[in-house]
């Protein structure tokens, strides 16, 4: 059974060797020229939040995001999202509602947003807005 866990900032260095390649895998598709090492400090200082999905003690997916304050609304913006296999999104998404979605709601977010490739937008059945998908909470 897959389970999602929010990694406390103090524990990130312990898992970094396993998490870093997954973050880089997600970021390689962006235009921002950002890599996992660029995001380590924001994760450790609590600006970004790192979720892992574990299956039988193996990290199979990561989700990295941060809060974005707009004049009238607040979002949880997902910076990086990847599975180790490149598949298993259905199984990972089963953990998403009880973890990332609840986390965003508890923290006063009105929606979740993520910039994704078109294929993932279609698979998630989220609103595709120029590859920026949103989930209203």
Predicted regions: what is each one?
Residues 28-49:
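Active-site rim helix/loop that mediates acceptor-substrate recognition in acyltransferases
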Residues 1-34:
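Short amphipathic alpha-helix that is part of the acyltransferase structural core
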Residues 71-124:
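Acyl-donor binding region in acyl/amide transferases
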Residues 14-21, 25, 38-42, 94, ...:
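Charged/polar, solvent-exposed surface patches and flexible loops
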Residues 47-48, 125-128:
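Short glycine-aromatic motifs
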Residues 115, 128-137:
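Conserved catalytic-core motifs of GNAT/GCN5-like acyltransferases
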Residues 45-87:
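Conserved donor-binding loop and adjoining core beta-sheet/short helix segment
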Residues 1, 75, 130:
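A residue-level signal for beta-strand positions that form part of recognition/binding surfaces
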